[in-house]
Amino acid sequence: MVDVNRFKSMQITLASPSKVRSWSYGEVKKPETINYRTLKPEREGLFDEVIFGPTKDWECACGKYKRIRYKGIICDRCGVEVTRAKVRRERMGHIELKAPVSHIWYFKGIPSRMGLTLDMSPRALEEVIYFAAYVVIDPMDTPLEPKSLLTEREYREKLQEYGYGSFVAKMGAEAIQDLLKRVDLDAEIAVLKEELKSATGQKRVKAVRRLDVLDAFKKSGNKPEWMVLNILPVIPPDLRPMVQLDGGRFAASDLNDLYRRVINRNNRLARLLELNAPGIIVQNEKRMLQEAVDALIDNGRRGRPITGPGSRPLKSLSHMLKGKQGRFRQNLLGKRVDFSGRSVIAVGPTLKMYQCGVPREMAIELFKPFVMREIVARDLAGNVKAAKRMVERGDERIWDILEEVIKEHPVLLNRAPTLHRLGIQAFEPVLIDGKALRLHPLVCEAYNADFDGDQMAIHVPLSEEAQAEARLLMLAAEHILNPKDGKPVVTPSQDMVLGNYYLTMEDAGREGEGMIFKDHDEAVMAYQNGYVHLHTRVGIAVDSMPNKPWTEEQKHKIMVTTVGKILFNDIMPEDLPYLIEPNNANLTEKTPDKYFLEPGQDIQAVIDNLEINIPFKKKNLGNIIAETFKRFRTTETSAFLDRLKDLGYYHSTLAGLTVGIADIPVIDNKAEIIDAAHHRVEDINKAFRRGLMTEEDRYVAVTTTWREAKEALEKRLIETQDPKNPIVMMMDSGARGNISNFSQLAGMRGLMAAPNGRIMELPILSNFREGLSVLEMFFSTHGARKGMTDTALKTADSGYLTRRLVDVAQDVIIREDDCGTDRGLTITAITDGKEVTETLEERLIGRYTKKSIKHPETGEILVGADTLITEDMAAKVVKAGVEEVTIRSVFTCNTRHGVCRHCYGINLATGDAVEVGEAVGTIAAQSIGEPGTQLTMRTFHTGGVASNTDITQGLPRIQEIFEARNPKGEAVITEVKGEVVAIEEDSSTRTKKVFVKGQTGEGEYVVPFTARMKVEVGDEVARGAALTEGSIQPKRLLEVRDTLSVETYLLAEVQKVYRSQGVEIGDKHVEVMVRQMLRKVRVMDPGDTDLLPGTLMDISDFTDANKDIVISGGIPATSRPVLMGITKASLETNSFLSAASFQETTRVLTDAAIRGKKDHLLGLKENVIIGKIIPAGTGMARYRNIEPLAVNEVEIIEGTPVDAEVTEVSTPTTED
């Protein structure tokens, strides 16, 4: 066998008859499988041991030779080779077909490859292959056209007319094979190339397609006649097994049935030919053989599929590869693995961040081999078998051994669906009682896990390397930041937030206010003995906390704080300022000076002058974590997070917050607000009855009135709320619930959507405290049901989107340090109308500059060229008033099959510059796909008469962008740069005309009457600018402008959708995806190159082809960029393995085989499929080919002690 990690590429071609014979170990002549009495395979049948190898290891069929010592001997009695039984998984047989048979993939596929090669229509081919018509092969001296069809009757008439033997016409696949043999590739290609110079329209399209196929045959060395089979390979029997069930019946693979039909028909045909049977009978048998082979290769492709028992279609060879259950996706890309388990998860609040609790029974099963090895090593058992018995008996001594074995051995925990890379993380196992896995509460957010019955899978990394990678790269404590936006993903939630919120509250006039303590311990003691409350504002000597970064003025003073905040600051990293106010200034700069007083000053007066600070909310805790990470990186941050978690749980327990019905306040003037709304609605309806407004206007006015009433109640609720109310505390802290939940409990439920998505005019006036009437309850069920169905549909859509995104970008890896491009991307803030969707500062952080950034007024250089922009630099640039910056971007990167470090910038998951080998394509796809479930499903009605177009939003809009579809509500764009000189309305055609005049010419654009205009007369417009509201069609923009404009537009559009839903995604992720959509060009004029016109090819391949021609002084080819949707881009990838495992498996493989395509295994997917280590991360060539350390041996002379010198030599070598 070839070592899987050694070969560099894999090629697929058509198999020639001689190749099939060379694979085969013998001909299968009989349709028999297994003898039903002896259960032994029949001779010359589909399971024959002579052909395929023995069924038992090292044993021939008759039993003459047994044991391994006869290895390789062929038994003289039964003819079976003595070898391993697993050769039955690799040895093939063959069937010699008595008549040629066409291969259905090449005849039926779209476009029909046989048809294109012969220049015949697929219908004509079908008539010939299935014996409905004759085809003229050689007209000789008759006036017949070659390749013309003759019916049975016409054939006989022509024979009589011209005499027997005056021309050659045949039917069946044999005829097609003869025609294919006669194809002169070089001559045909020359003719087509001539034709292309003058042809236009449909004729040109066809010529390009034919040329493509013929050229593929010529370049690959495949012969066209191999598309017709004379010999059929039989796949190894263990890949189409037959097993005995309990009841003595057999379960067999469908392929055996399909092969049996082929063999039966082939044998019958052989007999008929021997007997010289009448032509019509032989013809019929040949047709049936053709149909049998078609069904074997791709059942159901032509006509009705062949069915088995219960009219179930049989699974043919093609079906074995296709779809989610096919070979690619079921067995090659997603295998089940050993050393794994799954169980329900429960919360483990006492665990450290890098730990997880594993039940004892589970651990002993998972680590069994390790425990057994240790048992034998300690001489507790004589051999492995005894050790295994010991473990299975549950001997007391195994538990201590297990404890030692799992120490320092990380395990992986995974929760399905794994939407992003944080869905699998490594933990150190801790043995626990019970049967549930224990999970640290802070990692729940990354997994999107909760403890209402979720299950998780556990995996054990076995090799030293796997353990090292799990520990260094995947440990949960390392994953503080979310790869999609670089923000902390492990923010505390629920109880932890509530506890810290309660702890940091301040209260005026609580017991012990104004007491001054000498240090932390004294303050805590006073609190524990009831002299002061957690919320009491007290003084504490600054000198008692020498480790905090105080300013010189603040030292030796007394600081006003609360006991709660003293405890809260206890857990903070030492170098952070003492936190009193929940704001950034306090966190990043220093504790505000107003809280300090001189010893002897009146503390009560100072306290009275200070306003009460709001407590620390979830958002503030997130900022503290981000700042801690920025300063101290992972180790300190994860330790701090554990302290924060413990403190939060402890104090939310002590606070003992409860919720009762009395905690939901009653709004005093609710009745008045609702009455006023009723009157207003009555007035609106009156006006409508008088004909003062349209139905649409009335509907909008009524719904607006009720919406305003609900908002008025909400506003009243917020004004009158008591900050100590437990529900308010939960809502305000960000622990649970939001204002809309609160207003449904205490205000009114408001308007509901009907099943058709239109909002009903009758609102629900009650709230949950008062309780709903039966009718109101019924109304509210519509919304609930719609919510459930939407979520279910959205999950599926979002998952499929992620799959397509991953597929198109999986081969984008950081390949080099710097590509040395001379282009950059000029960026500004992204705006949507007047609103800023994404600020310039956000877009700058973590990118490299292309040119240096200068201060717009003073001209001083703020950031040098090719420099990584940090948060502080970005703030400085924006503060200086800079509005646009040229940065290095993925769009302009020149690296082949990937990106370089400088064009990418920082890795958002670590906050450091990205490493070579990082699989940024997959990360980008996950970052865009994972929040997909949070996007809405519906297209919004903008309401009113203002616009007749629905603006697509949410998930459908993202799909529209990435699939490069024509958008709904398309905007009209101008092709001319210049000034809008006139806008005329034409009431007869209900359109408007916009006239744009520029230096290069003028344009006249027809716009629908109802469209909202974006421009006015006198406006300056650029090429490709939208004249009306709506989305621009990207393909149209590409025709008018350049690639970069389209890329920038798509980037902005994606960001608008996500940001409007409150989801932040780093620009670079979208850039990676959009670049993949624009990586191909279509050849327009081949010039002196040997490219074919109309071919789609990678930009890098195109420039290579031109480079050589330009150097030798020829005419280079011209091309134009093509924008492809992600599905199409995935199928057009250079790797046929990746494309075939994505969609349209048979089409991709047919095409690849004709072209004799080579897969250079550059992406991740193709390497996973063949079982090679992926070429990203630690699997990259530059990290793998490291020589072992060479040790110089020093000769030691007896009697004199010598220190041996060890020199380390480590030289990385690269394959390329």
Curated annotation (Swiss-Prot):
Cofactor stoichiometry and binding remark: Binds 1 Mg(2+) ion per subunit.
CDD domains hit by this protein: RNAP_beta'_C, RNAP_beta'_N
GO CC term, one of those recorded: DNA-directed RNA polymerase complex
Disulfide bonds: none
Record-listed Zn(2+) 2 binding positions: 819, 893, 900, 903
GO MF terms, alphabetically ordered: DNA binding; DNA-directed RNA polymerase activity; magnesium ion binding; zinc ion binding
Catalysed reaction equations from the record: RNA(n) + a ribonucleoside 5'-triphosphate = RNA(n+1) + diphosphate
Its biological purpose: DNA-dependent RNA polymerase catalyzes the transcription of DNA into RNA using the four ribonucleoside triphosphates as substrates.
Protein family according to the UniProt entry: Belongs to the RNA polymerase beta' chain family.
Protein's recorded name: DNA-directed RNA polymerase subunit beta'
